[in-house]
Amino acid sequence: VCISINEVVCHGIPDDGKLLKDGDIVNIDVTVIKDDFHGDTSKMFIVGKPTILGERLCRITQESLYLALKMVKPGINLRAIGAAIQKYVEAEGFSVVREYCGHGIGRGFHEEPQVLHYDSPETNVVLKPGMTFTIEPMVNAGKKEIRSMKDGWTVKTKDRSLSAQYEHTIVVTDNGCEILTLRKDDAIPAII
């Protein structure tokens, strides 16, 4: 479990001594292994009364994930999905982190392909039924640049702006995808 608060982009280390305050945005990222297969998901939570920026950032990040999920089907290039996420996020005045991405997942936690959340000519993977991977855009309220902390694990926004992330593990079906990590409060069907 990673718990990332406010400007922590990813890999936040849980800390019993850290008190949350009104308006904090918190990402909880959970990985499970069941029957030798991995699953990976994350979700944002807002503590108490949300700030306008915090609520908007979380909403736009989740919407960018849903937009991407609705695009998944055989024959689609992952580049188109990354480009759509980037276009949507940047049109809202936010930025997409470049150093971290979604990933293939199965018996191994990080497998091919890499799933970039921005447009890159180096992405040339065409989706096929049975492919299983995560989509997990990390979106910053400020600039896209990040920095690693001295603990060698935690990553924060360089400009100390807020960061949000939503993630699902999916499998490509014959005509769309199935969300393997769907939550009861998700506003999207399990099978798209």
Where are these regions (language model features)?
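Active-site neighborhoods and metal-handling regions in enzymes and metal-associated proteins
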Residues: 1-192
